[in-house]
Structures are given as C-alpha cells and as structure tokens.
Amino acid sequence: MVGVKTQGEDILEYGRGYSEDVDIIREREYPQLKDTTYLDHAGTTLYAKSLIEAFSRDLTSNLFGNPHSMSASSQLSTRRVDDVRLRALRFFKADPDDFDLVFVANATAAIKLVADAMRDSRQGFWYGYHVDAHTSLVGARELAAKGNRCFSSDEEVEGWIQSLREAGPESLNLFAYPAQSNLNGRRLPLSWCETIRRRSEAAGGNTYTLLDAASLVSTSPLDLSDAAAAPDFTVLSFYKIFGFPDLGALIVRKSAGHIFEQRRFFGGGTVDMVLTREMQWHAKKQSSIHDRLEDGTLPFHSIIALDSAFATHRRLFGSMENVSSHTRFLAKRLYDKLAALKHSNGERVCQLYTNPFSDYNKAASQGPIIAFNLRNSHGAWIGKSEVERLATVKNIQFRSGSLCNPGGTSGSLGWTGADLLQQFSAGLRCGDDHDVMDGRPTGVLRLSLGAMTNLADINTVIQFVEEFYVERAAAVESLITPVPSIPVQQPRFYIESLSVYPIKSCGAFRVPDGKRWEIRREGLAWDREWCLVHQGTGATLNQKKYPRMALIRPFVDLDRNVLRITCGELTSSDQQVLEVSLDREDTNLVSTSICQRSSKSSTVCGDQVVVQAYSSPSVSRFFSEFLGVPCTLARFPPQSSSRFSPPKRPSGAWKQYLRKFVMPGSFPQDSSPSSAPERNPILLSNESPILLISRSSVNYLNENIKANQKKKKRAEGSSSSRAVAADVFRANIVVAESFTQLPRVESPYVEDHWESLKIGPEHLQLDVLGACQRCSMVCIDQFTGVRRDEPFSTLAKTRKINGKIVFGRHASLASSEVTRDEHDTTERWTLMVGDTVTPSYTHEE
C-alpha cells in the first residue's frame, strides 16, 4: 500500500509499506477487534490470526522435545531455538559476534537478571535511573548496596555524565533509563549509552548502561548495528511487538558479559558439572552468555512461536519503519484533535501531558502514546475511573492510572513524595478508584497506538470525548429536569415493587404482592446476605465481570425455610436447582447437612470481610459450572455485621448543582454537618442498607434514550434502542406516582429533593442518604445477562454531577425507628407493595 487520501488530506504515511489497506488487514487478521476500539498497545499489541494458525501448523507438523535431551525431537527444538535467537538479533540489527540474546519471561525478568548479577559482584554496585523509568527499573535500586540516585531531568543525567571523568575503576555503576516513556511516549536520547561508555573508559571507570526498550520497540525499529554506541544491556518484551508469544529478551553486549561471572545462582542447563555429596562444586557453561543465564528448560514452544511472529509481522507490515510512520501519523492526528477540543465557554477539555521538547512529527523525540486527563467547563477534573467505565460500555479500551511509571506520573500531576505518602495514609492505592485527591488527579488516561490501529479508532475516540465530555451551551438546559411544585394532596407516591437480592450481584427475588416484608437496620430481610467468592482469590464475584450472574435467581421460601436457587434463562426447560437453609443452625435438610461452612476472608468493595463459605463440593459445582469460574457460596449473617455504610452525604454539592437550573431560593443554606455522622450497618451491599428508584425517573430516562437513538439515526430494531427495565438498577424499592386527577404529569428525579420518607399505615420512616453512583453494571439485562450500552450512555449525558454518574437514592431506617426497634424486640418493621410513600423535601421546614 503506497498511501491513501481521505477528506482531501494526503496521508502517505498511513499504512505505507503495508501488504494491504489497514482496514483489510484488520478485518482478516484481527477478528477480535470487531466492534472494538483498542488503544492499549503499550500494554500489549494484538496477535494476528495467521500467526496463531502458522504456529498451530508448526506444532502439529513437528515433534518438539525438551532441548536438554539428545533425542531427535529434542535436537529439532534446539536447532529451532538457535535459529530464532539469531533471527531476533538480526531483527534489531545486532551482530551475533558482538551481542548475545537471552530469552526471559519479560522485560522485568531481564532487568532483574542484570541487577541480580551486579548485586552478586564482590563490591556491589551503585545504581542510577531516570525519573521516567518504569517501576521495574526503579525496583532495581533495592539491590544497589553502594547507593542509588534518581535523575529528575535530562540535564541532571548529562551533568552526571560529565562527572564520569572523575570516577575510579573501583566503582561498579549501572545507569538505566527507558528508550521511550511508557507514560506519554516521550523518547530519551539513545546517544547517552555511547557517551557514558566513552567517558567511563577514558577515566578507567566501570560504568554500564541498561536500556529499557520495551515501550520503544512496540512501534519503532531499534538499531544495534553500532556495537560501540549500543547499550551494554537491552531489555524488551516480544508481546509488545507481536502480541504473541508472551516472551522477553535480554540483549547483552558481549564485552559486558563478564558482569555475570559472579552470578551465584545456577539452574538446570547452565552448568557442565555439579558435585553435591563429598564436596560442593560446579562448573558453569562457558560456550555462550545465554548458556550460562537461561536457567532450566527454556519455554521452547514460545520461542518457536516467535519464528511465526517474525514472519507474520514482516508479511503484513513490511518493516518496523513502516509501523513507525503509520503510528506517528495517527498519533499526531489524535493529539491535534484532542488538543483542539474546547467547551462552549472556551475552556480546554483535555489536559495533555507532554515533554516540552517532544514533537509528534518527529520519531526521535516522540512515540505514539498520548497521556491526558479531562476537565469540565469549570475546570474541575473528571475522574479517570468514570471515563474508563463509560469507555468500556462503548467498547473502547485504553489504560488509566499511574501506568507503572511513578516518577513520570507524579511529575506530570504535580505530586511530591510527601504528598503521595500523605495520600497513601489516606487510602490511595495503585489501581483503586481514588481519582481526585486534594484537587489533583491521581492518575492519567493513556491512549497508545499499534501497527493495526486505523483512522476509525482515532475518530471513535474523538467522537467519544466530544459526545460525553465536551459541554455545549445548548445541551445544559436538559441536564436536570426542573422539579415541579409539590401538590397539597397526599399521598402522591406508593411502593410499586419490592426486591430482595439474597445473593450479592445475582438475580432479584420479587416480594409478592400482599406480602409484608421485614426491614432491618441492615436493609430488607435476607437482602445481600450471601455472595459468591472466587475459590482462588477470595474476591467476591460481581456482574461486571460475570454477567451471567444475573441468571442466578434466588427464591426466599419462608414456608419451607430455604433459599431456593435456580440457574439459567427463565424460558429454559433444564434449569438447575439448589436449596440451602435460611437458618444457620438448621442441619435437618439433606441439602444443607453437607454444606459445612468455614470462615474465609473475602474482599467486598475494597473491604476485607469474613464470610462463612459453603465447603460442599455440590454447592461449588452448582455455581462454578454455570459461571465457568471456580467459586462457591458464602454467607455474611446480620449478627456478625462489621461493615458500615459511609455517613450520610452532605447534600450541598448536589444542591449547588441544581441551583443553576431551578428558581432561586428553592433551597435553604446548608446546615453544618454533625461532628460524628451516623453510619449504618450493612451486609454485602455496596454503600447503604436500601436502594430506591422512581418509576417516573425510569420513564423519563427511557424517553431520553429513545430521543438519543433517533438523533443518531440508528437502525430500527437494534438492541441498543430498546427501553431499559427498572430491574437494571437493582433497587430494593421502586416508588411510583399515584395520580388522582388529570393530566397525568410525572415528576422525574423529584427524589433528588427527598430528605426522608414515611411509608405505610404505621408511617415507617426512612432517611434518604444521598445519590447512588452508577457503573456499567446497569447495562446488563437482568433477564438475559446480555450487556448493552444503555442506560449508562444516556445517564452519562443527563445525570452527571462532579464527574459521577448517579441514578436513584440510598436510604436507611431512620435512627428513631432503630432506637424504637431495639427497645421493643417483639415489634418488627415491615413494608408491602402498595404502601403509600410520603416524602419530606429538602426545602421544607
């Protein structure tokens, strides 16, 4: 492919040198990309279909034995490994007379191999690393007995290089840095390796260089043809180039190979002789560096797969130079479009993190990676987790967080070490949802491109940001529905439905009409008292990861005192059934007599809790076979409750937001919060004992969904255009309006103004705690287990406050009811479908 033109723009670099048009290659070779935008190539790129097919043919056509044997099959494996090793060196233009290549698991394993060898030297070593280093490079500092230093800038590095003339031969030094930052794609000078060597040798010093090339080689050629200018040690991961196999390499400049002579550990295949009885002695292999370092049996099947990877990559893309040109063009286009996005008030949407000297037009200074965060029109940060959740719903995949680049991330975001220690004490952890702390983001969003990225990927991301995060003046008015005046007649509302979710994240048990249901401090009776836990990790399973959990439907049979559980679609004729006792002490039933429980620590929404796990193989098999994951049932009884919901949320933020859209004076000034806000006990619920939603709000949301679909002119009958059922919100209580006169005008989102509710003939009081933050789990159809993009997509446009998508309200028994209940143990509060609901509003005295 020579080049194409699109929209009048000459883009000769797009797919230049490829075997065919990029879109044709994608359709044939990357079926896993169908309906998906994948922009996390810095993590791993994707493997081609023909690569897997070629490797499969290789495996089924040849007999490969363990390379450490002398059989014909073993010798075939040895020959193939040797051939692939040479091919890998040539891929990086490394002369085998000057370099050796050691196969390892990944780049991190290669770094550790070098650091371990230097640690084992008699005098130890000093270690220096660049602030943009990957976490694995930073970790090597712990092995440096002579000290270490983090260079916070290129200027510091170059100043240190100048001082190498004063270094003596007694000092063993290692300087490590990334060829390309995995955070933002900034490329560092490869010339440092040659300069360091020249100055160190001139002073009789002993300084070596380690280049982390893992990020660079994913889309760019690495030329090691000049051995005098090359790093002493180069580390990389092949899966970042080809997607498969999962394999890494350490390329050693042979003149630096003596560093490994003091290495203490030895494994099978790296020695010529070992004595173990009369004396302890061994002789290391001397034939090559890789013979001394590749401990144990090589992953020879993966190495053989690498042969197919080289061939497939060359056939499809021609060369790494072609990939570099292709991705450079797309990265420049993406960067320019993101940088140009503005809100209606002129404020920029994207905060882009780049080096001042980087240029997306120049391969020497910048790779195809873009790091950024989003702001709203008022300059407030939009949480990275919220963006990633919505992107997942839209089938867009990228990475967020600190990206295993602690120095680069903290520097870009303005965090000092003292700041981060303070935030760590406050609960900040790698991979958590603490998106913004002390007014600053804790991580970034990263888009990274690969050989098979196309223009459609770029356009999809831009359209995604424009649709959901660019604020336009015309759209603001529809963001919040004005609250109608509250009519005098009461009641206006009633309980339309009551739902209990006995097993966390599984299907609902709908309380029958006419049945009064007990409500406790922890919520509705039997609600979220059980959960499914992974038998390996102890983590609680949820529908976000396992959508089929929606098809696990518990039934609370009070007459028989059992929880009856069925699996499968409602229309299925072969549903499986399991019963467990509701009574923890009841062992009379056969189904529970074998359900012995053992205490097991589990993680629920970040909390460590102790649950009682059913150890019966039949229970585990029932759930494991249906979900396809090793799990079992566990219980968290009310009497052992040790979890608490967050304190009642101050409503000020929500009120301030609403003030922009309703009449002045609708709300009084916020009162001062209590110094010790009450916290409600919960079982396995996420945040509160009770979750309620409004039928009117669901109806209004569906109107918005339909309007959005018409606006986009989507094909009629597509799954995404259907109205959503109230069930997707997994509420305990659905409140509906009762109309006594015409016209019937609903009041959507009136629940945003509720302070408390009085329910039923006994006026049971519930306190409304705050808005319920939503995630992509609402996109799972609770009747089929199928994931869609609604209602989350529409909620993201119409129900967002401070970057959080909300729908429904958290609630709990009022403290007065709890106190009364504790003093009179014979009285139990109950609810029933049809009970009247009388709300009090935040602006009522």
UniProtKB/Swiss-Prot annotation:
Entry EC no(s):
2.8.1.9
PROSITE patterns the UniProt entry points to: MOSC
* Cofactor section: pyridoxal 5'-phosphate
Query: Domain MOSC spans what residues?
Result: 666-840
Catalytic residues, chain numbering: C404
Q: Which residues carry this modification: N6-(pyridoxal phosphate)lysine?
A: K240
Which InterPro entries does the UniProt record give? Answer: Aminotrans_V_dom, MoCF_Sase_C, MoCo_sulfurase, MOCOS_middle, PyrdxlP-dep_Trfase, PyrdxlP-dep_Trfase_major, PyrdxlP-dep_Trfase_small
Gene3D superfamilies cross-referenced by the UniProt entry: Aspartate Aminotransferase, domain 1, Type I PLP-dependent aspartate aminotransferase-like (Major domain)
Enzyme class, first EC level, given as a word: transferase
Alphabetized, the UniProt keywords read: Molybdenum cofactor biosynthesis, Pyridoxal phosphate, Transferase
> SUPFAM superfamilies per the record?
MOSC N-terminal domain-like (SSF141673), PLP-dependent transferases (SSF53383)
**Catalytic reaction(s) noted:** Mo-molybdopterin + L-cysteine + AH2 = thio-Mo-molybdopterin + L-alanine + A + H2O
Q: Which GO terms describe its molecular function?
A: lyase activity; molybdenum cofactor sulfurtransferase activity; molybdenum ion binding; pyridoxal phosphate binding
**Biological process terms in GO annotation:** Mo-molybdopterin cofactor biosynthetic process
Pathway assigned to this chain's UniProt record: Cofactor biosynthesis; molybdopterin biosynthesis
What is the annotated signal peptide range for this record?
A: none
Role? Sulfurates the molybdenum cofactor. Sulfation of molybdenum is essential for xanthine dehydrogenase (XDH) and aldehyde oxidase (ADO) enzymes in which molybdenum cofactor is liganded by 1 oxygen and 1 sulfur atom in active form.
What the record says about family reads:
Belongs to the class-V pyridoxal-phosphate-dependent aminotransferase family. MOCOS subfamily.
Q: Which PANTHER family match?
A: MITOCHONDRIAL AMIDOXIME REDUCING COMPONENT 1, MOLYBDOPTERIN COFACTOR SULFURASE MOSC
The name of this protein is Molybdenum cofactor sulfurase
Provide the taxonomic classification: Eukaryota, Fungi, Dikarya, Ascomycota, Pezizomycotina
Q: Which gene encodes it?
A: hxB
